[in-house]
Amino acid sequence: MIKVKKLKYRFKSTSFEFNFDLNSTDIVGVLGKSGSGKSTLFNLLAGFLSPNDGSVFLNGKKITFLKPSQRNISILFQDHNNFNHLSIFENIILGIDPDMKQTQSNLKIVKNIMKKVSLNIDLQKKVSDLSGGEQQRVSIARCLLRKKSILLLDEPFNSLDPGLRKKLYEDVKSMSLTNQITTLISSHLIEELKTVTDKFLFIDKGKIVENKILSYNQLLKNKSFKEYLQ
C-alpha cells in the first residue's frame, strides 16, 4: 500500500500538492494536461525529486527522503533509460543482476521476457543499433523483470504500434495482479487505459481532483476533466 500525504513541491512559480492512498494490486491511470504534474508526481515517488513538505509511505514505512535505490519502486519514462554501449541482454538483465552474468539461467530469463514484449532480435546486439520502438521495448522488459512493489509507467507505450500496446497493457495487468504490484500508468491514451483499469487519478493545476481515485464515470462529472477531454 502507498500513502501520499500533503506532498508538496515547488518549482519557480509553480506549486504541486498530492494526497491519495493506493492499495496493493491497484492499477491506476494518471491523467492530466501536459505540465499538470504527472511526471513531477512520478519523480517524487521514485525519489528523483525531493519534496518541500509532506510524506510518502510504502507499506507503512516512510520513504519520503530515501534514495531511489532504497525504494521498492521501478519507473519507466517515455524516453527509454537504456545504456547504449551495452547489449540487449546486458540492458535487460541489469534489472535483477548488476553483474550482468551470462549464465544459462539469466539467458533463459531474458529470452522469456523478450518474448513478452515481442522483441525477436539477437540479444547480443547493441541497444544503440535498435530502432526507437525496439529500444523502448528493451526498457519495458527490464522494468517488468524487476517486479518491484510499485511500478510507475510514464507514457510508456506511446511510441509502439496499437497491437503491441494492447498486448503490453494486458501483460502489465496480469503481472500486477499476480505479483500484487501497485501500478500507476500516465498516458493520454485514455481509451486504452480503460481496457486495463477503471481507477484514475486526475491531476489538475498541480493537485489531484478530490484527492482520491475516481472511476471514469465519476470523472465525467468533473468540469475540469470535461475540458481536458475537449
Locate predicted features.
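Catalytic Walker B motif of ABC-type/P-loop ATPase nucleotide-binding domains
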Residues: L151-E155
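Conserved beta-strand-loop-alpha-helix hinge in the C-terminal portion
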Residues: K207-L229
